[in-house]
């Protein structure tokens, strides 16, 4: 860790949060599906599929982070997100949309808590874990600003159409993937209870609830 630049790592995590949550199609997916002719019943079923897939993969996604590391898990999350958007562009019926929605849920699960855990481990590696609350506060602010901006762009997404809107999400997803791959992996930090560190702050829980509503 002698050449580890904690400031650069934290700034990359801030940038990753900002880029990751600017998803104009993801923020307006219900309206986009309605625009494509899907009924309210079908949209409700698709949202149920999202939550079911999210519940089924919640524990396995945590195992992935513990076994393969936070950095690889974040990168995989961004890759799955890009594939989900691509699947949505190519979808032409209820079944293919459901497949894309399930992939989106897996992406959310892989990312959920992983950025926070990597930030905490990074700060702990340089004995600055007391700065984690400051990081979490700033990260939550960036998340809210970015996700709100994406929501405000819902009209733009509807004007562009679902294919172009998801293409924009893919563009930002690829940037996020590049940032995730450039992060420094931190390993070997175990919490006081003998478990790998994985901070679950109130801010993170609020963010997770907001994500599942999108």
Where are the language model's segments positioned?
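Juxtamembrane intracellular "pre-TM" segments in multi-pass secondary transporters
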Residues: 1-10, 183-214
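Helix-loop boundary and gating motifs at the non-cytosolic
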Residues: 2-56, 89, 214
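Hydrophobic core of transmembrane alpha-helices in multi-pass small-molecule transporters
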Residues: 18, 84, 95-111
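Transmembrane alpha-helix termini and helix-breaking/packing motifs in multi-pass membrane transporters
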Residues: 35, 88-90, 147-168, 172
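Residue-level signature of mid-helix packing/kink "hotspots" within the transmembrane helices
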Residues: 51-59, 144-148
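C-terminal ends and interior cores of transmembrane alpha-helices
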Residues: 79-93, 97-98, 181
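Cytoplasmic helix-loop-helix junction between adjacent transmembrane helices
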Residues: 102-143
